[in-house]
Curated annotation (Swiss-Prot):
One of its GO terms (cellular component) is cytosol. Homotrimer. This is Molybdenum cofactor biosynthesis protein B. The lineage of its organism: Bacteria, Bacillati, Bacillota, Bacilli, Bacillales. Pathway: Cofactor biosynthesis; molybdopterin biosynthesis. The keyword Transmembrane helix does not apply. One of its GO terms (biological process) is Mo-molybdopterin cofactor biosynthetic process. Belongs to the MoaB/Mog family. Signal peptide: none annotated. It comes from Bacillus cereus (strain ATCC 14579 / DSM 31 / CCUG 7414 / JCM 2152 / NBRC 15305 / NCIMB 9373 / NCTC 2599 / NRRL B-3711). InterPro entries: MoaB, MoaB/Mog-like_dom_sf, MoaB/Mog_dom, MoCF_biosynth_CS.
Length: 169
């Protein structure tokens, strides 16, 4: 079956959990979380869960695993904590949970960021994607620009297709 055929069979509505990782954001100040919600809704997807967690490995893993265990979640989207400071532990937390890494997500995110957005600063991004069982997790930087780029260029065009692939096994 071709990619085109897979995309035709893919679900039109994907159920998502948004996790914002920040020591300072609140629901009112979480612009990237709000942007994720808007972009998903505009694309016809459903946000079934949303939370803000602190920049610590255990809290991040608990939030991701809570999404994994929920029946009404197909995808967990995290934003924040992907940089190189001491407090940035999202990648370590998420990668320890993954069954399979979607290596192309991070590679393409950095390439597009380099070419279209932030130039050589793209090398500092540690965005990651992967699967846990039949669910997918994408972890992206916390800036609104990075969220918009990741969603519009990479995640939204493939969200239904990825969900289809994980459920046809």
């Amino acid at each position: 079956m071709s990619v085109t055929e897979h995309k035709k069979q893919a679900p039109k509505e994907v159920r998502c959990k948004i996790v914002t990782i920040s020591d300072t954001r609140t629901e009112e100040t979480d612009k990237s979380g709000q942007l994720l919600h808007e972009l998903l809704k505009e694309a016809g997807h459903k946000v079934t869960s949303y939370e803000i967690v602190k920049d610590d490995k255990e809290s991040i893993q608990q939030a991701v695993l809570a999404g994994y265990h929920k029946e009404d979640v197909d995808v967990v989207l995290t934003n924040g904590g992907t940089g190189i400071t001491k407090r940035d532990v999202t990648i370590e937390a998420v990668s320890a949970l993954l069954d399979k890494e979607i290596v192309g997500f991070g590679e393409l995110f950095r390439m597009i960021s380099y070419l279209e957005d932030i130039g050589s600063s793209a090398m500092l991004s540690r965005a990651i994607g992967g699967t846990i069982g039949r669910k997918v997790v994408f972890s992206m930087p916390g800036s609104s620009g990075a969220v918009r780029l990741a969603m519009n260029k990479l995640i939204l065009p493939e969200l239904g297709h990825i969900t289809f692939e994980l459920h046809r096994q």
